[in-house]
Amino acid sequence: DASAKFQPPEQIPQTRFKPAAAPHPPAVMPDIFAVLEESTFDPKILQACNGQAVCASALFKGSGSGREAGPLITHTTAGGTALSEFTFLTGLDWRIFGPGGALAPLSLASHMQATLPKHLQTLGYQTIAIYPVGRNFLNAREAYRYYGFEHFLGIEDLDLGSDWHSLRDGQLFDKALGAIDKMRD
């Protein structure tokens, strides 16, 4: 049986995406900011939601942890942030890898060859990731290195302490913008 002798290649070359050539001559390029603002808040707990149709919407129903099987086929409330990040940065839905895909940032990030940060670098962009929790949370620093970010800053790097549960968006954005200004090429 030939399948018993099959040896997978050390690295499977991707053919889906081709790196773009850097613009010549270098053009003034706009800054690109992508902000993942997830909701871990279930609106059904509000008294104002009692009897309101929008609060009973199928968008807030799912069949599992993180509601990842909802009608939008995306996380709707609570959980799955690292999976949303993986999907956005790689262009791959983690579910195509089966149950093991639920650990994509831990088990698959190191195998990603064509990612959004790497593509942006071929266009001449500097890539900086600002992580709103501890840099080692769910191995984020390593995953983001594999995704191709040149710089990765967790809340420790922004002097925001370690209590990310009480961190306000405004605090994070102020510190992040200050750090980005210092790091610009």
How would you label these PLM feature ranges?
Residues D1-D185:
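Soluble catalytic regions of membrane-associated enzymes that act on cell-envelope
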